[in-house]
Amino acid sequence: MCPSIETLSGSPFVETIRIEKGRIHNLPYHNARMNRTRRELFGAREEIDLAGYIHPGPHQERTKCRVEYTREVLQVEYVPYRMRPVHSLRLVTCDEIDYSYKSTDRQCLNDLFAQRGGHDDILIIRDGLLTDTSICNVALWNGTSWITPARPLLCGTMRAYLLDKGLVQAGDIPVEDLPKYTRIRLFNALIGFGEIDEITRIYAVSYTHLRA
């Protein structure tokens, strides 16, 4: 069973931030999401700027900066990042999942990920619509534009950046419309747009669509 918002508020929340060549990527988007979570779940009115907590200078290779917080910042850690190759996805359905806040409690996502079988990751369907993989937002190419689901599980920071820059457009993608798209990209705060663009198959009972 997926945890409720009330249950999640008892777990720390997290921002995972890309550091590379001594630079913090998309920090304003991380600040905005963290402060929105603090305000909506903890009633915090004062805003926090993570620039005062993160020390990017020593990190030249791509690094995952992991900031755990509730009302206040709890801890900051740095881990070298290695991108996991993804070439195939398995469609899984869960209408009850709610991951609108980036919590450290990922049990529901982990349970769904365990259903991937021999495939690299999952693509989650909620209420008949495409949402996210276990760790990424997605965008699909319709021949003229990149469309990202309008109702993702989590509104990611890279997704927000791409929307602001006009590089993707938001729209509903019913699962039965998959044949209308020819490519799919996965992205998140650590994975740039276009870095995972070699997915050749999406698998389900009756879906084996998309081509590279």
Which residues does each PLM region occupy?
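Short beta-strand/strand-turn micro-motif
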Residues: 131-137
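Conserved small/polar residues in nucleotide/adenosyl-binding loops
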Residues: 208-212
